[in-house]
Amino acid sequence: RGLGDVYKRQVHAYETMNKECDIELCASMGFLNAEQLHRLHEAGVTSYHHNIETSRRNFPNICTTHTYDMKIETLKLVKAEGMWACSGGIIGMGEDWEDRLDMAISLAEVGVDSIPLNALMPIKGTPLENERRLTEPEILRTIAFFRYINPEADIRLGAGRALLTGDGIKAFQSGASATITGNMLTTVACATIRSDKNMLKEIGRETK
């Protein structure tokens, strides 16, 4: 699916950032074809984010505008291009333990390099407002078997850290290896960068 002028402007933005900033570039632009991904790669993008959101069985309950296979095919194109594939989803959206296991296996089969795991924070007025909040043991168990099934991938904590004690310190002891920090990308703010660095230093983890 072509993105026309919007896509061209985004490619230009990545080219500029690649020249002027000493950072790794990760794009999140939805469904792209092989040619578009190659152009992004040439522009300096080394990682592509494309969440599968949930299990194949539960996906139609969450999304009706596209299919699970479309998600998987995009990730395969990312890997074929030689870019890092970043894909995960949200737990607590009505799925059961088998769904979470299937999701972890789907990501392993594609060979994703980074897995952002979010825990749903039910918010009034949204379609999933009545979903039960996950307990900390449930979240930690999920992280642990995602780590077991995807031993080489980065497991990244995303939304839902407010459901964990101690800013999520036990999550890192359960298999998480990275986190989204600050209040820029989640509806409910995460911990601050400073507090996260202090927490990671406390358990002997390195930060940049």
Ranges and model annotations:
Residues 1-7:
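Short, small-residue-biased leader/transition segments that mark boundaries at the very start
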Residues 9-19, 35-42, 70-80, 102-109, ...:
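Alpha-helical scaffolding segments of alpha/beta enzyme cores, especially the outer helices
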Residues 19-21, 108-208:
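Auxiliary Fe-S-binding modules of radical SAM enzymes
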Residues 8-41, 47, 52-56, 91-99:
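Canonical radical SAM enzyme core domain
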Residues 33-40, 94-106, 162-174:
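Catalytic cores of alpha/beta
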Residues 8-9, 63-70, 95-102, 130-138:
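Alpha-helix N-cap and loop-to-helix initiation/capping positions
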Residues 24-30, 49-51, 86-90, 116-118, ...:
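A cross-family glycoside hydrolase active-site/sugar-binding cleft signature
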Residues 5, 57-62, 124-129:
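A short acidic, helix-capping loop that chelates divalent metal ions and anchors anionic groups
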